[in-house]
């Protein structure tokens, strides 16, 4: 039976069960506007029903949003636009990469030495979005085929509510030219910008072997993090992804066996993996439940986890190429350039939890960096969350894959491994 009924407000009001689920309090960085999110930015954990961690409320809200049709209105507006640039409140956007690239070249938009001017893809939909993950039981329920069809269409439609905008990437290795005295290989760079660069000669020989990655690469990265952040007391690498469009082997993901699979696609959309809520929720569920933890088992009580999280902690993603990157580089945006910009929440609905990632609209002032021809020993680091909220340090960065217009047509696509971690102080 379809759930196209009611309103988001009523869905939320129906949730009366008092839950023992960890519920993060509302949190904002000093000077940061409220997010564009459901429930005024409160986590769906606040709407737990009999231990479901808010998953039913989030799924119902997804159907309400589809029925209200605002997302479809954005698609209709974009698809009815004439070819060429589309005037938006953020600037000129383009439906096609090639159109945006032609505009960049025609207007002589140039980057400094080592940099690159190119199209980057942003959302233009200023509403929260919902993604029902592939492991959710809804997809396998024969009684909910109509619901699954509607959700599948909505998921595809996320990409139809995006445009390409012109941006400039600067060479992150030359960071000191843009920020005198700030080395890209320093914790100070992470504190200020939310991005940095590290060196790693890994002894892992096969990054397609999940067990070897966990056994060899995870400890290497934990050691790297503790050396990079001298004030840190603990580092936990908890999962990883492998990206290789040209991989010919088995790509199958199996979370129960700690196998992430091999991604054929690259996330070509400006986003961040966490936010104010999920940065804390993800940490606590790792410490107390080992939920989707591919790394070292954790055995914290709730009280011990609360004590650990009462001190500073960060979520850091680290991306290491398997070979020199020729195409589909991984690019990073530095914190100060969007510190006063509201993020847009994307809810990822599992059977047992509601994750939150974030998307951003375009600004020409966004401060983008890349590592041209990034080598296999160069590890790009980006902050996904920082528990310090007083504005003294970066809270996060955001990132995307992109297409390098200067690469040869036969350049191989990026092959890399991305690990996710928490660092505690």
Predicted region positions:
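Catalytic core of Fe(II)/2-oxoglutarate
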Residues: 356-425
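Non-heme Fe(II) oxygenase catalytic core, chiefly the N-lobe of the double-stranded beta-helix
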Residues: 14-27, 31-39, 43, 50-53, ...
């Amino acid at each position: 039976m379809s759930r196209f009924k009611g309103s988001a407000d009523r869905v939320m009001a129906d949730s009366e069960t008092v839950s023992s689920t960890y519920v993060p309090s509302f949190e904002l960085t000093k000077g940061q506007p409220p997010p564009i999110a459901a429930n005024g930015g409160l986590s769906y954990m606040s709407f737990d029903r009999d231990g479901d961690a808010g998953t039913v409320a989030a799924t119902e809200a997804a159907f309400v949003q589809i029925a209200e049709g605002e997302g479809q209105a954005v698609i209709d507006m974009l698809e009815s636009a004439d070819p060429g640039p589309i005037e938006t409140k953020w600037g000129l956007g383009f439906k096609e990469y090639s159109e945006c690239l032609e505009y960049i070249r025609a207007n002589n938009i140039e980057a400094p030495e080592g940099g690159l001017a190119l199209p980057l893809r942003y959302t233009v939909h200023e509403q929260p979005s919902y993604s029902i993950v592939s492991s959710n039981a809804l997809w396998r329920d024969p009684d909910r085929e109509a619901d699954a069809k509607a959700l599948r269409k909505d998921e595809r439609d996320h990409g139809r509510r995006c445009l390409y905008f012109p941006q400039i990437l600067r060479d992150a290795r030359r960071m000191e030219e843009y920020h005198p005295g700030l080395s890209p290989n320093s914790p100070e760079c992470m504190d200020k910008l939310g991005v940095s660069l590290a060196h790693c000669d890994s002894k892992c020989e096969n990054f397609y072997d999940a067990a070897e990655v966990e056994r060899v690469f995870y400890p290497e990265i934990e050691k790297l993090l503790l050396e990079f952040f001298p004030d840190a007391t603990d580092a936990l690498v908890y999962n990883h992804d492998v990206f290789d469009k040209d991989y010919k082997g088995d790509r199958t993901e199996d979370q129960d066996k700690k196998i992430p699979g091999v991604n054929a696609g690259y996330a070509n959309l400006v986003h961040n993996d966490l936010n104010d809520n999920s940065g804390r929720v993800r940490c606590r569920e790792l410490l107390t439940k080992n939920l989707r933890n591919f790394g070292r088992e954790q055995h914290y009580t709730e009280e011990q986890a609360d004590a650990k999280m009462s001190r500073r902690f960060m979520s850091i993603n680290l991306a290491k190429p398997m070979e020199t990157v020729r195409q589909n580089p991984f690019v990073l945006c530095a914190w100060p350039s969007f510190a006063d910009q509201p993020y847009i929440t994307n809810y990822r609905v599992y059977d047992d939890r509601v994750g939150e990632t974030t998307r951003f609209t375009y600004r020409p002032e966004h401060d983008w960096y890349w590592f041209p021809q990034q080598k296999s020993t160069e590890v790009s680091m980006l902050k996904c969350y920082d528990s310090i909220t007083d504005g003294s340090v970066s809270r996060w960065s955001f990132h995307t894959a992109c297409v390098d217009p200067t690469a040869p047509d036969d350049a191989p696509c990026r092959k890399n491994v991305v690990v996710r971690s928490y660092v505690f102080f």
